[in-house]
A protein has these predicted regions:
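Short acidic-glycine-tyrosine-enriched beta hairpin
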Residues: 13-22, 32, 39-62, 119, ...
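Short histidine-centered beta-strand/loop micro-motifs
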Residues: 22-27, 65, 125-130, 171-173
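Ligand-binding loop in jelly-roll beta-barrel domains
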Residues: 6-7, 47, 57-89, 164-193
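A short glycine-rich, His/Asp/Glu-containing loop-to-beta-strand
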Residues: 1-24, 28-30, 92-125
Length: 221
């Protein structure tokens, strides 16, 4: 039987001033960083450019570039250390979501995925579930997420959590294209495979208009 452990999946935004130093990772956690603006440097060389993502699981010292950096960060951290900040005092952090999830205890039995999902105007994602939990953040446009218990409209910069179990329906605005970036934790067998399952049989054969772009898809270390 696959033993599981409880761990926090957090999302926060961080604004670094030009050249400021930040120790992103401590021994107890894993971080996916998406560089929304600016860039990050390591040893005076570009480590992460604007619009790129990285999965970090070892202690690492990074500096913002000459224009600073706006970072969107997802972290996995154990229960004991969940309240500890990752970065130096000169950074501005804004934690927006903290959700307790369960993941396989054995190394390699879970994977971490970061990708974007884009929708043309008026497009939708039919009612579906996913094979694991994750946090989404809207990059552009507007999108409405309908679940069993609630319906919420999200705008650029808004973040939300999906547990993967509750079916959701996603409707993009008709005014413009919409897209979000997400980090989800999945069973290891889903590496390179879609995590989505459509709930209603009548939707299986319908055209799917959402477009995916992958950044990270690798075993959780």
């Amino acid at each position: 039987m696959n033993e599981k452990i409880n761990i926090y999946l957090n999302f926060y935004k961080e604004c670094l001033s030009p050249y400021s130093r930040s120790e992103y990772l401590k021994p107890f956690n894993h971080v996916v960083i998406f560089c929304r603006e600016g860039n990050l440097k390591k040893d005076n060389k570009i480590f992460l450019d604007e619009g790129k993502a990285a999965y970090i699981h070892t202690s690492l010292d990074l500096n913002a570039g000459n224009n600073g950096a706006v970072l969107w960060c997802w972290e996995l951290v154990d229960l004991e250390n969940n309240g500890i900040r990752l970065s130096e005092n000169d950074a501005k952090q804004y934690k927006e979501i903290s959700e307790l999830i369960s993941i396989p205890k054995r190394q390699g039995d879970a994977l971490i995925r970061c990708d974007t999902v884009s929708f043309p105007p008026s497009a939708c994602a039919f009612t579906h579930t996913h094979a694991g939990p994750g946090i989404r953040v809207l990059l552009e446009g507007e999108i409405r997420i309908d679940g069993d218990q609630s319906s919420n409209l999200y705008k650029a910069g808004d973040a939300w959590f999906e547990n993967g179990i509750e079916p959701v329906f996603a409707q993009a605005t008709k005014e413009t294209s919409s897209s979000f970036i997400r980090v989800i934790i999945l069973p290891g067998e889903f590496i390179g495979k879609t995590s989505i399952t459509y709930v209603n049989e009548e939707d299986l054969g319908k055209p799917k208009t959402q477009i995916y772009k992958g950044y990270i898809d690798e075993p959780l270390k």
